Amino acid sequence: LAKTIVNPGGDDQDRGQNAFFYDAAEGLLTSVILLLAEYVPPDSSGHEKRHIVSVFKLVQELLAPSGQGKKTGFQVLMDNLPSTHKARWFAGAALNTSEQGMASVMSTVLSRLNAFLDSELEQVLCFDSAIDAEHFAAEKSAIFLVLPEEDSTKNFMAGLMIQNLSRELFSVADEHGGKLQNRVVFYCDELGTMPPFDILPLFSAGRSRKLTLVPIIQSLAQLEKNYGKEGAEIISDNCQDTIFGGFAPNSQTAETLSKALGSRTVLTGSVSRGKDSNSQSLQMVERALLSPDELKSLPKGNFIVMKTGTHPMRTKLQLYFKWGISFEEPYQVPERAQREVYYAGKEELLMNIKKSLYSQPQPVTASKPDGYMSSYAEK
């Protein structure tokens, strides 16, 4: 989760000289998430405080001076942990840098978490979810993720959802011999308008685990804009099936796909007539299977299907309701009133850490028999 938040694109090469700050921010965020999960259980009323907004609140509070010399609240918190605690290890890079570097690392974490500060998102993120990867893969089910078109600030949730769910599904597949019990398909409509995320492993690692990704875009240029030329080529090369149609008159994608369709050999000829004689010539020439102009003029409802191992096919694809598929009643999203959100704080976390450590039984050292040292000294 921390890696997805700090580096959603998954490309470490773009960090340059700031690689240390991003790596340290990833470790610090992992550390805070571990502490929140371990030491902040639900309160006596059952209110859950372990959510991503509490992580932001904790990092903001721990950035402030502690009043103990020049140490920040985060450094004081780490001092209260055992030297072998994993949270302390993850935060090692941030703890062993300068004061200014420490502030830069924590500011990087806060900037990455700013996107989660939304009252509407809180109602989704700060409460338990019914989505469970293991049950989702084992049962016949579907998840619909609907994002508001008028508010693009929430688009990052699509990539975050796909990345985390796919990683959990990878773990489920590994527990069942390397494959999921049922095939899982991600239909990513308008993928080209979404912020870039680490999508490439889904194509390489997902196929062998019965996990399929269906990216739906309007133009190949959208992929190149978000993932670069090399990333766009990798995504295109990993698509075993390609369906396209309905091109705009000025579409450049039609030219690319026309070349991908290949060519055929046709017979052409010419006739020349003169005053005294006529001549005729025939020759075989190469011609595109479908030219860009022909692709752009495809009637509505007509599509080209390209599949690995077969020749391209032109077909008509109808909407689902024309196949006789209907629903008994429209699905209504249940309305939920504004629920109160509870947050974890620095003082609560520190108190729970001390309470947990002090309540653990101290190791008992073996006592030496009476007179041991004296008898040894006499010898």
Question: Which residues are covered by each model-predicted region?
Answer:
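P-loop NTPase motor domains
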Residues: L1-L211, N226, D293-R314, K322-G324, ...
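Conserved ATP-driven motor cores of ASCE-family P-loop NTPases powering translocation/secretion/packaging/pilus
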Residues: F203-I304
